[in-house]
Amino acid sequence: MSFAPVYSENSRALILGTWPSPKSREMAFYYGHPQNRFWPMMAALTGEPVPAREDIEAKKGIILRHGLALWDTLESCTITGASDASIRDVVPNNIASLLTKAPIEAVFCNGATAYRIYTKYLLPVSGIPAVKLPSTSPANAACRPETLREVWGEALKDYITVSNL
């Protein structure tokens, strides 16, 4: 099963991954692999300190204090290791339920597989076109951290809010 979505009544932008990696499942939270660039990148984009790998509450805070939401496209699937290419038997998450609880205006997919799954299964339900962003996964090592920050920052600039919590 996937993790619960992280959102609040102030979440305007939804960031979607594909499915938790084995390291993320060990940590019981999103982007738990120590080489995944997601949390350092989000800290840089929001002006927050980089959270400790084990500090789930700090990670949730980065998302919630800045008008964002975080989830995965899949509720369940069959996968070998962390290889998105091996995903089969997909069951998409119930995005309709989330959209009744948060005023999501924009969807951003972390990588091509999340984008492909969103477009096929979730876009028909949400009606919100997604923006495909480069994956923060260590498997996408060709994309430098500076490039990730630049591309993600440009995409999210109208949605990252200043913390009021």
Each model region followed by its residue ranges:
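Short, surface-exposed acidic-centric catalytic microdomains
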Residues: K23-S86
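Structural motif
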Residues: R12-A13, A106
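C-terminal capping/extension of enzyme domains
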Residues: A4-R12, H33-P34, T80-A96, T119-L165
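Catalytic phosphate/metal-binding cores of nucleic-acid and nucleotide-processing enzymes, i.e., regions
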Residues: A106, A112-Y115, P124-P129
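Internal catalytic-core helix/loop-beta-alpha segment
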Residues: R65-T113
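Short, solvent-exposed loop/turn segments at secondary-structure junctions
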Residues: P20-K23, N36, E75-T78, A112-Y115, ...
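Residue-level signal for well-ordered alpha-helical scaffold segments within enzymatic catalytic domains
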Residues: P40-A44, S97, K101, K120
